[in-house]
Amino acid sequence: GIYVGSTCDPETKKYTYGGIKLKQWGKRAGTILVPNGTYQQCDLANANILMISRTVYNVLGSFSNEYTHGIADFDYSLSAVKAGFPVWVLPFYCGECQNDHGPSWLPQGSTLKQRIKYLYSPKGLAYKQQLHYIRKFFPSEYNEMKIKLWLKTLFPFIWTYLKK
């Protein structure tokens, strides 16, 4: 199987990365699994601290080259679950790491050129990579995701309003 070591913020000690359990297979909505003293089975794993057994590696190989910054860890863990391998969140925090994800969209004050650049940036919204991932694992949400990514880019004030 795969073992996920969760991390917490060094100052606040709050969860930053680890595992997520999907609420329903085929839908992106999930629940963050905070270490609670027991092993918890998950579907999505952040690879900040990750142990992949040789058995899994021999079947799945390495992370996909489709992704340049993020998403590859989620792709890998979902592929493992799909192949019948368990993915476990360890019962305790294994390290400290600040959440270094940038904003999920740029504000209205940004120029359209900046927002479109952010849309396609691997460290921004990673448009092509995000859509590849969604098409592969959550195909029923593909069109919705495409609309959301463009809505965030073209009309960030609407997205800001909707997220309140």
Q: Language-model segments: which ranges?
A:
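Short, Asp-centered acidic motifs that coordinate Mg2+ and/or phosphate
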Residues: 1-2, 87
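A recurrent flexible, glycine/aromatic-enriched loop bordering the glycosyltransferase active site
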Residues: 30-52, 115-118
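Active-site donor/metal-binding and catalytic loop motifs
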Residues: 83-110
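A short, conserved alpha-helix in the catalytic core of glycosyltransferases
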Residues: 45, 50-61, 66-93
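Short beta-strand-to-loop element that shapes/binds the nucleotide-sugar donor at the catalytic cleft/hinge
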Residues: 3-21
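Structured catalytic cores of enzymes that bind and process phosphorylated ligands/cofactors
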Residues: 3-6, 27-30, 50, 57, ...
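Non-catalytic, C-terminal membrane-associated alpha-helical segments of glycosyltransferases
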Residues: 108-164
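Short, hinge-like loop/turn segments at secondary-structure boundaries
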Residues: 19-24, 105-108
